[in-house]
Swiss-Prot record:
Protein name according to UniProt: Glycerol dehydrogenase large subunit
Enzyme Commission identifier(s): 1.1.99.22
Ranges where the record places region Disordered: 28-105, 442-468
Gene transcribed to yield this protein: sldA
Family listed: Belongs to the bacterial PQQ dehydrogenase family.
Biased composition (Low complexity): 34-43
Taxonomic source organism: Gluconobacter thailandicus
A Pfam family: PQQ
Keywords tagged on the record: Oxidoreductase, Secreted, Signal
Disulfide partners: none
Keyword Protein transport: no
Domain of life: Bacteria
SMART domains in alphabetical order: PQQ
Required cofactor(s): pyrroloquinoline quinone
Catalytic reaction list: glycerol + A = dihydroxyacetone + AH2
Length: 740
């Protein structure tokens, strides 16, 4: 789940807090006594002590409200037929397996999703000379009368002579990578009412066909999932729909999901293609109802668009596509993050979230409890999980995994390399697993959790997993002395707020009688920006948040009085509550009220800065921290939403990730000061920065054109990070490139 944070900083306080920032250190992995003997991973979650209503009729039952709405574009497409997995054609060699030096072929550049480029023209010595090479306007931003839901989050890809991107509303665009001139644009006609919480398109997938001959239309194609649940394939050269993919280039992804309304389910992440199967996940809007549309994961033939298999958690032995009045089981854990494919192992690594109704788990099935907030490795030949590793047991804190897994090789005990997977989490725990088996390569301990909780029939897991072999991306548990403010009165207000809440450290259980403090918060730790990894130096780059939340369950009567209702209720009004943050959680005994842990009068967080950090970890020499610094200045932040203009790096909340290059640089936006930075990979020193026209909440990328290196970032802003929204893709280069 992705939600807003406000940050305010005053000049004097930023200065006063600088010693605190300088001494911010990694916390121990957390208190919690002796490690449990239980094994981390699948199924290690406690079961309810009371019988709870888990009737399978609920999992199969439709929403009591709206039928499939005609406004969902996918509903206008015919259903797609199925084929046997054995009929999927052998996949041609893909450029993402071994990208050309100057290309950025996938969301994370390559099949391993490292976000590393070998390009080295731009270095710490000359980065200060970077200038804007060109700006491209996507034209996608809120129009008069529309609620601002925009947060493009886009990372372009560059293949050969094309720079390919998408607008926040899913139009697919090809640009000249040296000039930014538009070569073609495919309007896919996503409607405003199909936007869920956010209008976002993280990117598109490049695929080379083994069926269509080279030189023919759609031999090279772009595949995209849309906000209104279509899977689209267009020719990479012309932008024309691929006629032999689905129905005229489109597949209806609403097929089998049952009843829904526009904006309830959506795709925002580029789908990976593994051994000829394009794997599709989707976001299900949080906080709505227990029996929301399914979180099913599906595989389609990348050549024809035909259905191949489904992984439906509560019908795990049935991989077929529902027909007639059947549909996938409702309310199951969904996956909204970007997945990672592994052609060698024939697996797709799926970061999962929670079952619908994040903060109440008593109605979840045993199968759901085993796979929520986990990495699930699905065999792309069958649709069956090969292994599951769970990062939070019986999660009621919205610790769904937002990050994409990064693949790398680790040295094994016998001198052989072990194929590894790095999985960041919102908890700030980074798990390093054998990607063949899901077993930890670096130590993981099960530690006692603080309390079973007080919610009837919904006890918490007695233990939780801690990745003790990696530095924890978090600070120590909060204390009352950590509270601060612009004045003694503000600090006193926050101390009183701290005392009024339940808080016993990480995994403080939910409560109804009073609020509880959730730290780490649901924005991380690490979130969807993921990590970047330099395979040459062995340095892993992570940016992360220190932003607690203040949550409270409310009775159904109270939820009704607050006007909380699900999106498919006929009385629901957009912007009237219940879409994110506060949620109805209809079908459970409770609603949920969620706010940042802040002083609502000034808009300042109650915990002292920093609120965002960037860290370099040496993965080749004991997983040690090389350096760690606050990320983000106070220039665009201040009390009551007023910018201070101060350049001090106080560390702001951040969303978006980084790029690391052969030139020894890290490029990152992410922070709420609306800047892009170049940071020396080895020292952490900022060697260049530039103010963006909108928030830099997107992963940047870098590529080469005409012999010169360029750096691109979508400065689209982010409505819930409260950064300026824009439609501008900004591309930088050294002066020699711009003169051409």
């Amino acid at each position: 789940m992705r939600r807003p944070y406000l940050l305010a900083t005053a000049a004097g306080l930023a200065l006063a807090c600088s010693p605190l920032i300088a001494h911010a250190q990694f916390a121990p992995a957390g208190a919690g006594g002796e490690p449990s003997s239980s094994v981390p991973g699948p199924g290690n979650a406690s079961e309810p002590t009371e019988n709870s209503p888990k009737s399978q009729s609920y999992f199969a039952g439709p929403s009591p409200y709206a039928p499939q709405a005609p406004g969902v574009n996918a509903a206008n497409l015919p259903d797609i037929e199925s084929i046997d997995p054995s009929q999927v054609p052998a996949m041609a060699p893909q450029q993402s397996a071994n990208p050309a030096r100057g290309d950025w072929v996938a969301y994370g550049r390559d099949d391993h999703q490292t976000r590393y480029s070998p390009l080295s023209e731009i270095t710490p010595e000359n980065a200060s000379k970077l200038k804007v090479a060109f700006v491209y306007h996507t034209g996608s931003y809120p129009r008069p009368g529309q609620v601002n839901k925009w947060a493009a989050e886009t990372t372009p890809i560059k293949v050969g002579d094309g720079l390919y991107t998408c607008s926040a509303m899913n139009d697919i665009i090809k640009l000249d990578p040296a000039t930014g001139k538009q070569i073609w644009r495919r309007n896919v006609d996503v409607k405003y009412h199909s936007i869920p919480y956010t209008a976002a398109c993280k990117g598109v997938t490049y695929f080379t066909s083994s069926v269509v001959p080279e030189g023919q239309p759609c031999h090279n194609r772009l595949i995209e999932g849309t906000l209104d649940m279509r899977l689209i394939a267009v020719d990479a050269e012309t932008g024309d729909f691929c006629p032999n993919f689905g129905h005229g280039g489109q597949v209806n992804l609403m097929q089998g999901l049952g009843e829904s309304v526009p904006g309830f389910v959506s795709m925002t992440a580029p789908p990976p293609v593994i051994n000829g199967v394009v794997v599709v996940n989707h976001e299900v809007l949080d906080g709505q109802r227990r029996w929301a549309p399914s979180g099913v994961i599906r595989g389609y033939d990348a050549e024809s668009g035909k259905f191949v298999w489904a992984w439906d958690v509560n019908n795990s032995d049935d991989h077929s596509q529902p027909t007639g009045n059947r549909h996938y089981s409702r309310g199951t854990p969904n996956s909204w993050a970007t997945m990672t494919g592994d052609n060698e192992e024939g697996l797709v690594y799926v970061p999962t979230g929670n079952s619908a109704a994040d903060y109440y788990s008593a109605l979840r099935s045993d199968a759901e409890n085993k796979v929520s907030s986990a990495v699930v490795a699905i065999d792309v030949k069958t649709g069956s999980p090969r292994w599951v590793f769970q990062t939070a047991h019986k999660d009621v804190w919205d610790y769904d995994i937002g990050s994409q897994a990064t693949l790398m090789d680790m040295p094994g005990p016998d001198g052989q390399t072990v194929p590894a997977l790095i999985m960041p989490t919102k908890r700030g725990q980074t798990f390093v697993l054998d990607r063949r088996t899901g077993k930890p390569i670096l130590p993981v301990e099960e530690r006692p959790a603080p309390s079973p909780g007080v919610i009837p029939g919904d006890p918490r897991s007695p233990t939780q997993p801690w990745s003790v072999g990696m530095p924890a991306l978090r600070v120590p548990d909060l204390k009352e002395t950590d509270m601060w403010g612009m004045s003694p009165i503000d600090q006193l207000f926050c101390r009183i707020k701290f005392r009024r809440a339940n808080y016993v450290g990480e995994f403080t259980p939910p409560s109804v009688d009073k609020p509880w403090i959730e730290y780490p918060g649901y924005n991380g730790g690490s979130d969807w920006g993921s990590m970047s990894y330099d395979p040459q130096s062995g340095i892993l780059i992570a940016n992360w948040n220190i932003t607690p939340m203040y949550d409270q369950l409310v009775t159904r009567k109270k939820a009704d009085s607050l006007g909380l209702m699900p999106i498919d209720d006929p009385n629901f009004k957009p912007g009237g509550g219940g879409a994110e943050g506060n949620g109805a959680m209809d079908g459970t005994p409770y609603g949920i009220v969620v706010t940042p842990f802040w002083d609502q009068y000034t808009g300042m967080m109650c915990n002292r800065p920093p609120y965002g950090m960037i860290t370099a970890i040496d993965m080749k020499h004991g997983q040690k921290v090389l350096w760690q610094h606050p990320l983000g200045t106070a220039r665009a932040n201040g009390p009551w939403g007023l910018p201070t203009g101060l350049p001090w790096e106080i560390g702001t909340p951040n969303n978006g990730g980084s790029v690391v290059t052969g030139g020894g640089l890290i490029f990152i936006g992410a922070a709420t000061d609306n800047q892009i930075r170049a940071i020396d990979e080895h020292t952490g020193k900022v060697v260049w920065s530039a103010v963006l026209p909108g928030g830099g909440q997107a992963n940047p990328m870098t590529y080469e054109a005409n012999g010169h290196q360029y750096v691109a970032i979508m400065a689209g802003g982010h409505h819930f990070m409260m950064t300026p929204v824009s439609d501008q893709l900004v591309v930088y280069a050294l002066p020699d490139a711009i003169k051409q």
